[in-house]
């Protein structure tokens, strides 16, 4: 299974244009508040866009970011957001001790307690991009905004949470709706990738969606699974000592796009996503990727590309790439000094992503 990225939508009759900028990220920055036993244990910069841009910037992949924040935004970020002076920044509270979720998993309970303005089509630049990433977390991406993205990006990757999240009008608790009822379904045949967690995947028909685009379902310690037309493949995880799951799926998607930008096949790019996700869960808030680890990963990516260019038989030798990435993964600084968040009173050590 090679699964190369979907081809550019340009045709031989398309007008000549300047070279693409690489990646466009669309989604609001947030302020994340982590709460356990009634006490705030951490407050950090959040939002999928922040985790993804961290991965891309650390990997030296050029990206533009469109994000809106309120007048109260105080974080120092590499990619400046649009400030809505009459609004407050989107805030999420994550409760790690409110019981078991609706499908029997010990997990966090997430609430949106404030929301900044949505991102409009007019906020999106008119330049062309190789890849677009629709990664809203608080309902900020509109159908017309996604339509603008598919018009200006050769390939668009969408996180399903940007499409199916709704919020309780009383306490802001995050709930999910079926993808067909989200208001975005009519656009999805034009996107390249749809990423979902295993829980979120219950809100779509994977068998149907895999014929519209490449579907990637993440499943924590089991790695991830790729669905595209008649092909399916499981991509193995990396062992991780989980501290906080926030941002793991976002870092996964960032790693996936880094791999695609570098010219890897989809399974190899997803393996890179698993690596970045596994590092993220070992930190509270934004991880700081070790420079030595990043260089080793870059070296292995280049080695993998050369290997696959020499012989197509290496495309399916996925385990070797995993084995070579593992030492690079564990050359990063150990995160054992990070405080542990307990989910329903239990530590989340020794999980894999």
UniProtKB/Swiss-Prot annotation:
InterPro entries: Carboh/pur_kinase_PfkB_CS, PfkB_Carbo_kinase, PfkB_dom, Ribokinase-like. The active site is at 250 (proton acceptor). Keywords: ATP-binding, Kinase, Nucleotide-binding, Transferase. GO terms for biological process: myo-inositol hexakisphosphate biosynthetic process. ATP binds at residues 197, 247-250, 274. GO terms for molecular function: ATP binding; inositol 3-kinase activity. Disruption phenotype: Low inositol hexakisphosphate (phytate) levels in seed tissue. It is an enzyme of class 2 (transferase). It holds the Pfam family PfkB. Its EC number is 2.7.1.64. It catalyses: myo-inositol + ATP = 1D-myo-inositol 3-phosphate + ADP + H(+). Kinase that phosphorylates myo-inositol to produce multiple myo-inositol monophosphates. Participates in phytic acid biosynthesis in developing seeds. Phytic acid is the primary storage form of phosphorus in cereal grains and other plant seeds. Belongs to the carbohydrate kinase pfkB family. This is Inositol 3-kinase.
